[in-house]
Amino acid sequence: MTDSKKYILTLDEGTTSARALITDKQGNIIAVEQSEFTQYFPKEGWVEHDAIEIWNTQRSALVQVLNKSGIDPSQIEAIGITNQRETAVIWNKETGLPIYNAIVWQDQRTADYCQTFDKDTLEMVKQRSGLIINPYFSGTKVKWILDNVPNARQLAKEGKLMFGTINTWLIYRLTGGEVFVTDHTNAQRTLLYNIHTNDWDDELLKLFDIPRNILPEIKSCSEVYGYTFKGLFSKGNEQRIKIASSIGDQQSALFGQLCLEKGQVKVTYGTGCFILTNTGEEIVKSNHGLLTTVAYSFKDKVYYALEGSVMIAGAAVQWLRDNLRIVYNAIETEWYADQVKDDRRVYVVPSFTGLGSPYWDSFSRGAIFGLDRGTRREHIVRATLEAIVYQANDVVDAMRKDMKKPIEIFKVDGGAANNKFLMQFQSNISQSKVIKPTNVETTAMGAAFMVGLAVGYWENAEELKKTYKVHFELTPELSKPEVDKLIKGWKVAVQRTFKWVEEIE
């Protein structure tokens, strides 16, 4: 049995910040440290990060969480990584430096290119990758960098470039450049991975004109990849720690919520909103605008999921605060929403960077419908929170159709899961029970569980289940006819934003 004074260290690299968390054997979070990094918007629809800044902030969070907790690096059993997916970095193998900023998952610069493929090609890509051709995924971002950064194609030809999503970049840096790997969940989100062979796909590489030699080796989500370099924690500290997990953030939340059985669903409310349902070892093809994705993997097995990705969720609340300036902070939104009824039927469609699942419309843009002279700030705040729910419900409804079964319970996490108004409205609209765990750090816990299983810190899923505690459960308070009326208004509103950019140009 592992010593109880040993801990798991998880690096949670998100869209706006890098975090480090220390977990004990009972699943308690001992300490958390967070460092924000800069968002770059060089052109309309473009979103970039500085990969060096990401590394520096992640390393800073790692060192600070150890200092803050008083835990020595020698007490860390192993390190796991969970990360924002799809964000693409290409760096020079000889210098270790990026040749361009990391292009973020939200970036839309390749939207026009994604419209150039014929129906047969789109179907081939979906069949092989489980995904659709969309700017969201890494493949078109990688192509853009290779095509637009001077000399990039030549350097790739000479074998001097390396591509990775953020997990690969961090593992490379943490190991001092010794290890160049990714995991099944992150690899699959590139558009370059075959979900049937669980390897890079030559046809997809050819389609996007991406050389195989720049790609990392694919490993499972739960195994030892290598060790941290000497001096990572401080100049005099030569401790080397195992890196034993890598998993995309949404898949990590699914595992952290212990949705380990087929049909179990989790909803994460972060910058975007991401809904996954476990389909076990079965690859389920969606006919309703969802993605087939890898849920998680071990050395001997790969598990799959259906996923719906909503581009704007918590970011809509940031928009209320930072752009419209009608709330001072996110916490206030719950109070404002409770001040008014929904009888004015105001709808906000926050498609600021297009619509994700199940619509997949890169040319939609945000809109507010149903305004009249009586509309107040409270109505707009309420409608913005409701929009997060409506978008999540569109995905849940598609899952019901693809799975051909009801979804009666889903587990929630993420910052907005603390908003009781939003969670009750989610239960109402989806006509399902909503369960929120006491430990809201489910994304970090998923990676921690993966690490623990890899190194024997936890023996099996039954041990993991003992760490899960429920904070609250909510059940629907509206009837189905009432809900149907509200959803009808949402459907009209969202459809009126379709193809907006295309139609006005």
Swiss-Prot record:
Give the organism's phylogenetic lineage.
Bacteria, Bacillati, Mycoplasmatota, Mollicutes, Mycoplasmataceae
The gene it comes from is glpK
- Tell me where on the tree of life, at the top rank, the source sits: Bacteria
Q: Which CDD domains match?
A: FGGY_EcGK_like
Q: Could you tell me which pathway this protein works in?
A: Polyol metabolism; glycerol degradation via glycerol kinase pathway; sn-glycerol 3-phosphate from glycerol: step 1/1
Which GO biological-process labels does this protein carry?
glycerol catabolic process; glycerol metabolic process; glycerol-3-phosphate metabolic process
According to its UniProt entry, the function of this protein is described as:
Key enzyme in the regulation of glycerol uptake and metabolism. Catalyzes the phosphorylation of glycerol to yield sn-glycerol 3-phosphate.
Task: Write down the species.
Answer: Mycoplasma mycoides subsp. mycoides SC (strain CCUG 32753 / NCTC 10114 / PG1)
Q: Which InterPro entries match?
A: ATPase_NBD (IPR043129), Carb_kinase_FGGY (IPR000577), Carb_kinase_FGGY_CS (IPR018483), FGGY_C (IPR018485), FGGY_N (IPR018484), Glycerol_kin (IPR005999)
SUPFAM superfamilies referenced in this protein's UniProt entry, alphabetically: Actin-like ATPase domain
Q: How is its activity regulated?
A: Inhibited by fructose 1,6-bisphosphate (FBP).
Hydrolase among keywords: no
Return the protein name: Glycerol kinase
Q: Which GO terms describe its cellular component?
A: cytosol
